[in-house]
Amino acid sequence: MAAPAAGAEPSSDPLVVPRGRLARATDRARSYIALMKLRVVELLLVSTVPVMLLAERGMPSWWLIAVTLLAGTLSAGSANTINCYVDRDIDQLMGRTKRRPLVREVVEPAQALRFGIALGIISTLMFGLLVNWTSAVLSVGAIAFYVFVYTLGLKRRSPSNIVIGGAAGCFPVLIGWSAVTGTVGWPAVLLFAVVFFWTPPHFWALAIRFKDDYAAAGVPMLPVVATLEVVTRRILAYSYLMVAVSLAVAPVADIGLVYLVPAVLLGAWFVAEAHRMAARAKRGEEIKPMRLFHMSITYLTLLFAALAAAALL
């Protein structure tokens, strides 16, 4: 079919969507998805499936895995969207966040808030009706903790913001366990602690890199209010705690060398990098914080992959 001539009347066919309208709709959908911060959600969900495998001591039903992941994505997306709504004033001051939809005004603040609340309601109903109500309660707790304790409470007030507030990112571990068992067991509690102690090194490394952004926005992240030597010592301390708890998972969860050997090797690798950072900071040398940031993602991914392997073997 030949293309219509320039200046021709647009089609009256109701099934044909004008290109401009389609492009605007696509951009709008992308903006709402961007509010959910799916790249962050992806990291959170890395821990969910391995914990489900451990709780089941095998492979749970694909239906349960799919529903849990979808509901978990919507739950985390709800918390992230509301976070974007609350932080829209400081996001415009930070180079890392100034392209977010609310800063660019491609989504109205009220619409973003309604979207975030709707995601939370849908995820809660999905967990409650399709998984179990224990998981639903944990999901609501995660959203509430992230929004009220971290975003509204600690983020702009305390250098310990990410230490305490980061607990919200640990809830997928508990939800993964409860989705299978309907309860929260000790292995899940220890894995929660692994992610809890992992969070400060992960985010402080990022905050070192974007220290000026946080300072401009008035967010008292530890690298803004403390010396680099102090920050790297804290990173090292939390790294040791993280590794110690990760090793304690093996006897408590009754899993063997398939998990323990990788946990030891990964832990040694991570602690060695944390030591390197602390030593270079003490000498006043460049520390390359993003190296630890990316290593932390690899560490957590491989640790939970080892957990999944141990659960299946």
Curated annotation (Swiss-Prot):
<feature type="transmembrane region" description="Helical">
    <location>
        <begin position="252"/>
        <end position="272"/>
    </location>
</feature>
<keyword id="KW-0812">Transmembrane</keyword>
<feature type="transmembrane region" description="Helical">
    <location>
        <begin position="129"/>
        <end position="149"/>
    </location>
</feature>
<feature type="transmembrane region" description="Helical">
    <location>
        <begin position="33"/>
        <end position="53"/>
    </location>
</feature>
<dbReference type="GO" id="GO:0008495">
    <property type="term" value="F:protoheme IX farnesyltransferase activity"/>
</dbReference>
<dbReference type="Pfam" id="PF01040">
    <property type="entry name" value="UbiA"/>
</dbReference>
<comment type="similarity">
    <text>Belongs to the UbiA prenyltransferase family. Protoheme IX farnesyltransferase subfamily.</text>
</comment>
<feature type="transmembrane region" description="Helical">
    <location>
        <begin position="188"/>
        <end position="208"/>
    </location>
</feature>
<dbReference type="InterPro" id="IPR006369">
    <property type="entry name" value="Protohaem_IX_farnesylTrfase"/>
</dbReference>
<dbReference type="InterPro" id="IPR044878">
    <property type="entry name" value="UbiA_sf"/>
</dbReference>
<keyword id="KW-0472">Membrane</keyword>
<feature type="transmembrane region" description="Helical">
    <location>
        <begin position="107"/>
        <end position="127"/>
    </location>
</feature>
<comment type="function">
    <text>Converts heme B (protoheme IX) to heme O by substitution of the vinyl group on carbon 2 of heme B porphyrin ring with a hydroxyethyl farnesyl side group.</text>
</comment>
<keyword id="KW-1003">Cell membrane</keyword>
<feature type="transmembrane region" description="Helical">
    <location>
        <begin position="59"/>
        <end position="79"/>
    </location>
</feature>
<keyword id="KW-1133">Transmembrane helix</keyword>
<feature type="transmembrane region" description="Helical">
    <location>
        <begin position="292"/>
        <end position="312"/>
    </location>
</feature>
<protein>
    <recommendedName>
        <fullName>Protoheme IX farnesyltransferase</fullName>
        <ecNumber>2.5.1.141</ecNumber>
    </recommendedName>
</protein>
<comment type="pathway">
    <text>Porphyrin-containing compound metabolism; heme O biosynthesis; heme O from protoheme: step 1/1.</text>
</comment>
<keyword id="KW-0350">Heme biosynthesis</keyword>
<dbReference type="GO" id="GO:0048034">
    <property type="term" value="P:heme O biosynthetic process"/>
</dbReference>
<feature type="transmembrane region" description="Helical">
    <location>
        <begin position="212"/>
        <end position="232"/>
    </location>
</feature>
<keyword id="KW-0808">Transferase</keyword>
<dbReference type="GO" id="GO:0005886">
    <property type="term" value="C:plasma membrane"/>
</dbReference>
<dbReference type="InterPro" id="IPR000537">
    <property type="entry name" value="UbiA_prenyltransferase"/>
</dbReference>
<feature type="transmembrane region" description="Helical">
    <location>
        <begin position="162"/>
        <end position="182"/>
    </location>
</feature>
